[in-house]
Amino acid sequence: MKLGDQTAPTNDTHLKYLARYGVRNICGYPEIEGDRLYATVDELKRMMDMAAKYSISIDCLDPPILASSHIDHEKHPAIMLAQSPERDRDIEQLQTYIRNCAQAGIPCIKYNMSILGVLRTGRVQGRGDAMYHQWKLSEAHPDTPLTKAGVVNADAFWERITYFLDRIIPVANEYKIRMACHPQDPGVPPEGYQGVNRVLGTIDGLKRFITIRESPYHGLNFCQGTISEDLEDPGTQIFDVIRYFGTRKKIFNVHFRNIRGHRNDFIEVYPDEGDVDFVKAIKVYREVGYPYMLMPDHVPLAQADPDSLQSFAFCYGYIRALIQSISEES
């Protein structure tokens, strides 16, 4: 396992910061000229060469489409809105990105299939002057208006997912690029929220997802925080979920994030103070043979740390120490 990171931008200043804290593997963000939704091979290699100056490897990419943003603010919403022919053009550009990643030597692309983005109801006081993000379904507004997607029931959402996978996974297979999908954060009740049924917001939904277009290159950006949010008792249940997807080799990247609480009522906290025992969790990743990155995800906020650089640095050190400790054990 490797300490990873997904923060942007991928430039000299930020790469120096990452190298300072021992981060050697990252998700990269190449500079893309024009309106393309993919980087050229030359653009990818320029980014990789820049990172290599700091002994950092680009292990994954985050494309400029299929982000975790709310659909009403998404620049390229066609895939999730099922808008043809626009979605076909966007899918073709992502297919090109897969081919270019293979040529450049970048093995993984992570993405979201989200309409509502990341849902939170507010912030609560944490330790010191830190503020923690919270989701409390009882405080969410049931009369929130529909998004531009309108009503999207489970059948419609699965159709959009399947349409996408039918066209992307064969290309990923051909070029041996792992496609890592993030769960929907957080899950919502079966009747949906803002008219949307979040089918990838349950463990059963994720189990179904990995069976569509079964492939060693079709799997998950396994956000342990989000998946913990889907459980009634994450402190005891998360380990078997890691085993389920890990033994099937469907975990391509890990967002190593902790929470306090449970489904429909939780706060995001530092990794050392949540309900999930991270020492036990990392041993389960080792048990299932997980070989890729463990990276921070959302971190607490503080007025004196507006870019969250201190919070991320704390997480880097914590994760790096865990990796070292289990390496010494073995």
Mark where each language-model region is.
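Histidine-acidic metal/acid-base catalytic patches
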Residues: 2-4, 9, 15-19, 49-52, ...
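Ligand-binding pocket scaffold of soluble enzyme catalytic domains
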Residues: 1-37, 42-45, 49-55, 61-63, ...
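Alpha-helix initiation/capping motif
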Residues: 11-14, 40, 136-138, 153, ...
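Structural motif corresponding to the early beta-alpha repeats
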Residues: 32-162, 166, 173-174
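Surface-exposed cleft-lining segments at the edges of enzyme active sites
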Residues: 145-160, 186-198, 267-268
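Short, well-ordered beta-to-alpha junction loops that form the rim of enzyme active sites
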Residues: 111-116, 183-185, 298-299
